[in-house]
A protein has these predicted regions:
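Hydrophobic h-region of N-terminal signal peptides that target proteins for export
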Residues: 9-17
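Sec-dependent signal peptide recognition
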Residues: 1-8
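Beta-rich carbohydrate-recognition modules and glycan-binding surfaces
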Residues: 16-181
Length: 181
């Protein structure tokens, strides 16, 4: 009996501190998109186009953000975004399992202190054709405007978006896993 409690204690002690950002299963597209929404620069007059879909790679489902990002008409983004409520400050960044068309992509975080829709914090990462893990630390996120607070904590986060942004290109970002760590 003591061995059982000791084993449980060890498992709890050595468990990683993480939070899955894909609360809804990727295997159920309809349910998943009740939490995550596709948004483009069309909301502000831009001409980028794209979509977010759920696909399957062998045995694993993943989210794909794809489309044509255009900087015409002051645009230049497509994204998939979800509101989040994070109750712990014990996180230091976001870890993703990604692949896609080789390019730079972004994580956009909005906090409860950002009131205007063009305000966010951006964390940059690169993808390749092969699946890989990337970690983007909160301390490496850049604020979009000079008048924003310089830093944020996990409990300040209001939404998380995965974004193809800032240049004219054909985007294809695949995300199999997304978690706070």
């Amino acid at each position: 009996m003591n061995f059982f409690f000791f084993t449980i204690f060890l498992l709890i002690s050595f468990s990683t501190n993480s939070m899955n950002l894909f609360n809804k299963s990727l295997s159920n597209s309809e349910e998943f998109f009740t939490e995550w929404e596709y948004i483009s620069d069309n909301v502000m007059g831009g001409v980028s186009s794209g979509k977010a879909t759920i696909l399957k790679d062998t045995d694993n489902f993943f989210l794909r953000l794809e489309g044509n990002v255009s900087t015409k008409n002051n645009g230049g983004f497509i994204q998939v975004r979800s509101s989040k409520e994070i109750v712990s400050d014990n996180f230091k960044g976001i870890k993703l399992k990604v692949s896609g068309k080789p390019s730079e992509y972004y994580i956009h975080i909005r906090t409860k202190f950002l009131l205007m829709p063009w305000q966010y914090y951006a964390g940059k990462f690169s993808v390749d054709k092969e699946w890989k893990y990337v970690e983007v630390y909160f301390e490496d996120f850049k604020k979009s405007n000079f008048y924003q607070p310089s830093a944020f904590s996990a409990t300040d986060i209001k939404s998380v978006g995965f974004v193809a942004y800032g240049k004219d290109f054909e985007a294809e970002l695949n995300i199999m896993e997304a978690e706070l760590f």
